[in-house]
Amino acid sequence: MAEITAALVKELREKSGVGMMDCKKALAENNGDIEASIDWLRAKGLSKAAKKADRAAAEGLVAIATAEQGAGETATAVEVNAETDFVSRNDLFQGAARQIAGAALGTDGSVDAITAAKLAGGETVQDHLTNLIATIGENMMVRRAAKWTVENGVVASYIHNATAPDLGRIGVLVAVESTGDKAALRELGRKIAMHVAATSPLSLSPDDLDPAAIEREKAVFTEQALESGKPAAVVEKMIEGRIRKFLEEVVLLKQAFVMNPDQTVEQLVAETAKTLGAPVAVKGFTRLALGEGVEKKQDDFAAEVASMTGQA
């Protein structure tokens, strides 16, 4: 049997990312063969990965990738989830998130297409994540994604609470169409992206807003106005005013720009168009906040201790 040296254990640990004791055991089981030990660890890890698949993955990273496309650009934002915030600082996980966002550029931007996309090494995104689950020991998944493309202009991006370049807890894309100067368009797009990160608008314009959301607010405002006991004509004007204020709060183009509340985002865009001497239009935006809508499991510490000591 080959001697299991510290150097061998270190090499296997660096290649696999697995703990030293597991590496030592793998080498012992495979007569010191590094490649066979890696396969052994993968097989061992994969058997555990299925058990981890039902754990809530509400942490992780939002990754962004951008590529020029003729006179325009395409960009993707991908939310890759893991179970703990600790993993988001892991180099392997960060590298995977970047690779996945890059692979998403060549897809239609749907989660199914992204998980089926192939990475540079030839394996699919899903296979890569499955192997990473085995290595790191946490459930991981591509939860949400978005892709924007403009034929002329830029897709600006912004990462809030960045862990590393193009990686963080909130990722925003803003598609800006124009034949104007790209540097100026990118500055405009980034400012709007920062605004979106801060205000979380529901839609780009009033026409894009879900009619059900408007009706819901209108019902609330109507009830409040009727309780005032004022004449019907006055009540109608009150409702109109409150709906207008609601739109100013949740519609991006109607919102007061956070960096200059004296103007709306729509006015900022018009001002930029005038300066550039070319039409400028915000085509759309996406805001991905890590773990948004995921119900995190609240562990019962006493029950956990009891189960570990066999007292449950």
From Swiss-Prot:
GO MF annotations in UniProt: translation elongation factor activity
Coiled coil location: none
Region listing for Involved in Mg(2+) ion dislocation from EF-Tu, in residue ranges: 84-87
Highest taxon listed in the record's lineage: Bacteria
One Pfam family here: EF_TS
InterPro entries on file: EF-Ts_dimer_sf, Transl_elong_EFTs/EF1B, Transl_elong_EFTs/EF1B_dimer, Transl_elong_Ts_CS, UBA-like_sf
GO cellular component terms given for this protein: cytoplasm
Gene3D superfamilies xrefs: 1.10.286.20, DNA helicase RuvA subunit, C-terminal domain, Elongation factor Ts, dimerisation domain
Keywords: Cytoplasm, Elongation factor, Protein biosynthesis
UniProt keyword Translocase, yes or no: no
Record localization: Cytoplasm
Family statement: Belongs to the EF-Ts family.
Function, as annotated: Associates with the EF-Tu.GDP complex and induces the exchange of GDP to GTP. It remains bound to the aminoacyl-tRNA.EF-Tu.GTP complex up to the GTP hydrolysis stage on the ribosome.
Protein name per Swiss-Prot or TrEMBL: Elongation factor Ts
Species annotation: Caulobacter vibrioides (strain NA1000 / CB15N) (Caulobacter crescentus)
